[in-house]
């Protein structure tokens, strides 16, 4: 009905205390790592755009099925954070801060499996957010360059 702002606002709505608690626990663990890696503004942009990306994929699949469900929650945006961290871990050769590629992939698989085997979990929003976060990280994240000592002094002889 043209109410496209709902693709944005759904990220801030939740279906109860347990729903918001689960999302906030993951956000508290993963968010600061990504914010430190990307900076405040890029992190905020990624979070918001990944949330809209998750909502959009969810909506597109509802149109394709012809079945419309209520969808809400921050998990699309949070999966966007996970997708971005997956890219960052990949370009840092499988490890970044306390994260490993295997650990992130395990978490993604377990989370999606839980969603598939549970009732009323919008995996399309999760997948959309994950993909959007991954793509945005490719665009926005720049691996820091190693510092070069131009003083001419040997750092190993002091």
Where are the regions a protein language model picked out?
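A detector for small-residue-rich transmembrane helices and their helix-helix packing motifs
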Residues: 1-158
């Amino acid at each position: 009905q043209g109410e496209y702002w709902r693709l944005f606002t759904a990220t801030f709505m939740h279906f109860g205390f347990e729903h918001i608690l689960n999302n906030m626990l993951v956000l508290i663990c993963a968010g600061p790592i990504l914010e430190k890696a990307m900076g405040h503004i890029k992190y905020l942009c990624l979070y918001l755009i990944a949330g809209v990306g998750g909502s959009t994929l969810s909506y597109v699949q509802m149109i394709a099925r012809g079945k419309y469900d209520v969808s809400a929650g921050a998990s699309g945006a949070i999966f966007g954070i996970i997708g971005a961290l997956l890219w960052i871990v990949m370009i840092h050769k499988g490890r970044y801060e306390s994260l490993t590629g295997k650990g992130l992939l395990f978490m993604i698989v377990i989370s999606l499996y839980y969603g598939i085997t549970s009732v009323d979990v919008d995996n399309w929003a999760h997948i959309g957010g994950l993909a959007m976060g991954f793509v945005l990280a490719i665009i926005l994240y720049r691996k820091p360059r190693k510092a070069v000592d131009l003083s001419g002094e040997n750092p190993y002889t002091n």
